[in-house]
């Protein structure tokens, strides 16, 4: 948990003071005790968006199994900063079961409204939207990003070994995305992706395809990200 606090300092000193505090206190509490509310200094105003990202095994089956959850924290003002923080799985297997039990999709594989509300509540974050990608979709995106090898599992992680594997594969992929965005090569990556084929068979969202493409265009028009980090709390 101490390592997690140190890693969160990256976010705290980059303007995400309130978010970092909430993630540390709500998602990975040091102990089960009542918290003392502390007044925090108001950070400099900034433009920020938060998206929650889900990885499942297969969107073509009746009940896709949850593999991983990440939160994407993006600030475009006063500076362009991007963070991917792992929320699930953790090394606390009991907590993993609790988080997994909240995940639920509708018949057309959209995240249920109750699940979305509960994830907002337990992580204490206001999400601007969500994305769900299955293993096939992730492998396709990894190929477009020139990730040579990505080891995936087909069921929810139930052991520390599978947790480590999921975290490693997620970090490999998202670190490559960070490299592309930080170097200004994001447009080249996104232009290679056949989104009309990927969505909705292997990639779904509460955003329409037009909305999603608009987000991509917005990112590509903005300056290169000064900071892009992948964080796995421990």
Language-model features: where?
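Non-catalytic, solvent-exposed segments at the cell envelope interface
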Residues: 2-6, 10-234
């Amino acid at each position: 948990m101490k390592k997690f606090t140190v890693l969160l300092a990256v976010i705290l000193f980059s303007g995400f003071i309130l978010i970092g505090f909430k993630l540390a206190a709500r998602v990975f509490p040091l102990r089960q005790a009542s918290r003392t509310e502390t007044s925090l200094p108001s950070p400099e105003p900034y433009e920020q968006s938060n998206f929650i990202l889900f990885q499942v095994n297969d969107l073509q089956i009746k009940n896709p199994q949850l593999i991983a959850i990440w939160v994407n924290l993006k600030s475009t003002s006063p500076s362009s900063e991007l963070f991917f923080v792992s929320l699930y799985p953790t090394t606390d297997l009991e907590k993993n079961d609790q988080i997994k039990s909240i995940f639920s999709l509708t018949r057309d594989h959209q995240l249920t409204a109750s699940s979305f509300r509960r994830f907002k509540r337990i992580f204490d974050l206001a999400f601007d939207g969500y994305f769900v990608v299955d293993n096939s979709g992730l492998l396709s995106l990894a190929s477009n990003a020139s990730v040579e090898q990505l080891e995936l599992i087909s069921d929810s992680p139930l052991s520390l070994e599978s947790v480590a594997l999921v975290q490693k594969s997620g970090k490999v992929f998202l670190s490559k995305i960070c490299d592309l965005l930080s170097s200004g090569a994001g447009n080249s990556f996104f232009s290679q992706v056949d989104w009309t084929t990927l969505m909705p068979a292997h990639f779904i969202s509460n955003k329409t395809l037009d909305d999603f493409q608009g987000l991509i265009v917005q990112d590509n028009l903005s300056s290169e990200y000064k900071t892009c980090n992948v964080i796995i709390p421990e």
